[in-house]
A protein has these predicted regions:
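Internal/C-terminal transmembrane anchor helices
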Residues: 212-239
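Acidic/His/Gly-enriched intrinsically disordered linker/tail segments
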Residues: 146-150, 179, 183, 315-316, ...
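Beta/coil-rich, acidic/histidine-enriched accessory regions frequently appended to metallopeptidases
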Residues: 152, 156-165, 169-183, 192, ...
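Hydrophobic alpha-helical transmembrane segments
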Residues: 1-62, 721
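Membrane-interfacial interhelical loops
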Residues: 32-43, 88-112, 143-193
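Central hydrophobic cores of alpha-helical transmembrane segments
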Residues: 138-153, 218-226, 440
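Active-site recognition of the HExxH zinc-binding catalytic motif
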Residues: 60, 71-77, 81, 286, ...
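Juxtacatalytic substrate-recognition/specificity segment
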Residues: 42, 246-363, 374, 378-382, ...
């Protein structure tokens, strides 16, 4: 008798048992996949998607077979099942955390409760709606409704100026550009509370009436009308962004023949004018490069900082283009570096594919490769120069590997962008842009080039290998010795804790910051943590302790992008410990490696300041103190290597600073790095509207003549200055 009862219970709950087993298997599978293997945001999102769907199925079955009479009966009959659905992924995550000792379990709890707990009620609401709206084939109808809700973000992504989404099934998506910093904030909590209340209200309303037909009609009408009202109010609640919202935030516009810029009130008229001039110049360059141009004006939205951009658009840490909308989204701090790259994405829409007008199979190698190739430079170095350094020092990725799966994202972004850009530039230069356009729409190398990717890869490597550049291990390490996205350990947790650390450092709460750093370093190696620990030790005056810490880290960062930066910080500590000779030896050694430009200037600046006996004041000083020191020493030495350290702190529109330019013009350019410093100063002057002085500085950069890795950059800037100095009217009428 008992066996029969148990068999009956199992038979009655066979669907639940099957779905629970499926949920358990999915949770275990997630632990093998990058990002979802950590108990964090992604893990919660995936389980929210699954639990919502499974509970919808169970709800439909419960209403169909058991037909509960009241809201109380409905809850009583499903409470244990709902609880088990909620707890299964949580238990598996807990066991995994204990066994692998990765992210602290408490880190994932806010994500899980905020995202997954409301999913229970969302699933019930969807199930009731489908039960009421569809009479036959309800499971098929459920799949349709479920997919419809999931596709709403695609509609928003396509039509609205945003890349983030709020959705009742998966709660929140920060954008198609990965951002490690996602917090459970007031907006997300509010959104999930609204989800919970709305979808559970469907259940309450369903049981208010005893008449089945009335129930069905009122549920359908209530759900559709409430959903429509929510969609209309969504931009005002901060859950979506329409054009009205973005223009309220960026009310100032500047327009030319081909570009329309949208700014906040912070930018000056001169700054806006330069950006539009520069954009017009890039527009003409890209038109010549692609042999085509967009059908309508490009709209460029420029946010004051990454925080504002994240709140309004999403993707705070990356600039983005929407080619199908002829729109680009930039931050004030990155505008001058990324403007041409993002504009290039808009140009590729002319030969792009699908509704989003991008590369075939949405291939990132082609999408980012052609935009990078059209610039010709990466961080002011020629693309092939950096690819050559990768080849010579064992970093260059084989193209078949880069085109495969998620390998583009497995590498550090600098490595993937550089390799893609250099390869695509090789293809365009050798075979022409028209063949590449065909490839962009249809990734079939044999069809369009008569060669497969392996053969083209061999051609490309042969081309790179014979480039006439000196090999430089330091440059290769700097750009290619970094971790990729899916190689990082517990990225959400470490990002949140790192932000907390730097907030504590800003408040000079060094002891609490050190305690967190020490805890994190037991599980992860991160340059941000290393840098923060050095700052804490310096702030506490624990110089000897800091030196020991740095020496222990030297092996860790050997051959990486941070090796020389760590050496510079070691030199700083040696200066503070009165070990000047040792510090100078480190800095001189860095100069001898012909490192990247910014590392060279960091080292050279310290050597100059040490010789002038102000190095300690510089290391311990704040930004204002450092700016004063730089001006003073520059006046004494006229050393052009100091220019990069002061140029962002100087307003050259102020006549009081004319003396700096006069000193520069009287000085002597001693090496290629100083040539580079003058090129960047020239660009800055042009940005501030002083084209005359910009040209004088650039003319100065031409001497001495001879081979220089920055000669291509110099020619590019010279041509741009020539065009910009001709004025806005001529640029528009060309």
């Amino acid at each position: 008798m008992q066996i029969k009862i148990k068999e009956g219970i199992i038979k009655e709950n066979i669907l639940f048992i099957f779905l629970a087993a499926l949920l358990m298997a999915a949770a275990v599978l997630q632990l093998t996949i990058p990002l979802t293997k950590f108990f964090s945001f992604e893990y919660s999102v995936v389980n929210s998607i699954l639990i919502t769907f499974f509970i919808s199925i169970i709800t439909i079955q419960n209403l169909h077979k058991k037909n509960p009479e009241s809201y109380r009966d409905f809850n009583t009959g499903t409470a244990s099942n709902l609880f088990l659905f909620f707890i299964i992924p949580l238990i598996i995550a807990f066991i995994n955390t204990v066994l692998k000792n990765q992210c602290p379990f408490y880190h994932g709890l806010p994500y899980y409760f905020t995202i997954v707990f409301p999913a229970i009620f969302v699933g019930r609401g969807i199930g009731i709606f489908v039960f009421c709206a569809i009479r036959r084939f309800r499971n098929i109808g459920l799949i349709f409704v479920y997919l419809l809700i999931l596709t709403i973000p695609l509609i928003e992504f396509y039509l609205n100026p945003q890349v983030y989404f709020y959705n009742p099934i998966f709660s929140f998506f920060p954008g198609n550009i990965y951002d490690e910093s996602i917090r459970v904030d007031v907006t997300l909590i509010t959104y999930r509370l609204i989800n919970l209340i709305f979808f559970e209200s469907i259940a309450v309303i369903y049981f208010l009436s005893k008449k089945i037909e009335f129930r069905r009609g009122i549920i359908v009408i209530y759900t559709l009308i409430t959903s429509l009202i929510f969609i209309i109010l969504s931009p005002y609640l901060g859950f979506s962004t329409n054009m009205e919202r973005i223009k309220r935030k960026l009310p100032v516009s500047e327009e030319t023949a081909n570009i329309r810029f949208h700014y906040g009130n912070e930018r000056t008229k001169k700054e806006m004018s330069y950006s539009t001039f520069e954009a017009e110049y890039y527009y003409h360059e890209l038109s010549e490069y692609y042999k085509t141009e967009p059908d309508k004006k490009i709209d460029a939205f420029v946010f004051k900082d990454s925080g504002e951009k994240r709140d309004i658009f999403g993707a705070g840490n990356a600039d983005v283009a929407k080619p199908w909308m002829n729109q680009i989204y930039l931050s004030e701090q990155t505008l001058n570096r990324t403007l041409k790259h993002e504009m290039s994405h808009v140009f590729t829409s002319k030969f792009g594919k699908y509704v989003f007008e991008v590369a075939d199979k949405i291939n990132p190698v082609l999408i980012e490769g052609i935009a990078t190739a059209s610039e010709g430079f990466y961080d002011d170095y020629p693309l092939h120069y950096l690819a050559f350094q990768a080849y010579k020092n064992g970093y260059l990725t084989e193209l078949p590997e880069l085109f495969s799966g998620l390998n583009f994202f497995a590498k550090a972004s600098s490595s993937s962008y550089l390799t893609s850009g250099s390869f695509v530039k090789f293809l365009v230069d050798k075979y022409g842009i028209e063949k590449f356009k065909l490839l962009y729409r249809d990734i079939d190398f044999m069809k369009h080039y008569g060669k497969d990717i392996a053969t083209l890869n061999k051609e490309y490597i042969e081309f790179i290998s014979i480039q006439d550049f000196p090999s430089n291990k330091a440059v290769a390490n700097y750009y290619f010795g970094r971790k990729g996205l899916i190689q990082k350990n517990c990225p959400r947790y470490f990002s949140a804790k790192t932000e907390e650390i730097f907030e504590l450092i800003a408040k000079r709460n060094y002891l609490d910051a050190k305690e967190i750093i020490s805890e994190l370093e037991l599980k992860n190696t991160s340059w941000a943590l290393t840098y923060a620990m050095i700052e804490c030790n310096q702030g506490l005056g624990e110089i000897r302790s800091c030196l020991r810490y740095i020496e222990n880290k030297e092996t860790t960062y050997k051959g990486t992008a941070y090796e020389e930066i760590l050496a510079i910080r070691k030199a700083d500590m040696l200066f503070l410990d009165d070990q000047t000779d040792k510090a100078m030896n480190i800095l001189v050694n860095i100069l001898s490696t012909s490192s990247v430009h910014r590392v060279y200037f960091l080292a050279k600046t310290r050597i100059i300041l040490s010789e002038k006996m102000v190095i300690k004041e510089y290391i311990m000083g704040n930004e204002e103190t450092r700016a004063h020191i730089f001006k003073k020493i520059f006046l004494q030495t006229s050393n052009i290597s100091l220019i990069p350290a002061i140029q962002d702190k100087i307003n050259y529109q102020d006549k009081k600073n004319d003396w700096i330019l006069e000193v520069v013009l009287k000085g002597t350019v001693k090496n290629n790095y100083e040539k580079y410093a003058l090129i960047k100063l020239s660009e800055l002057l042009a940005r501030q509207g002083n084209y005359g002085k910009a040209k004088q500085i650039l003319d100065k950069a031409k001497k001495p003549e001879g081979e220089c890795i920055f000669n291509e950059l110099l020619k590019s800037v010279e041509l741009k200055l020539l065009r910009l100095s001709e004025g806005k009217t001529q640029l528009q009428n060309e």
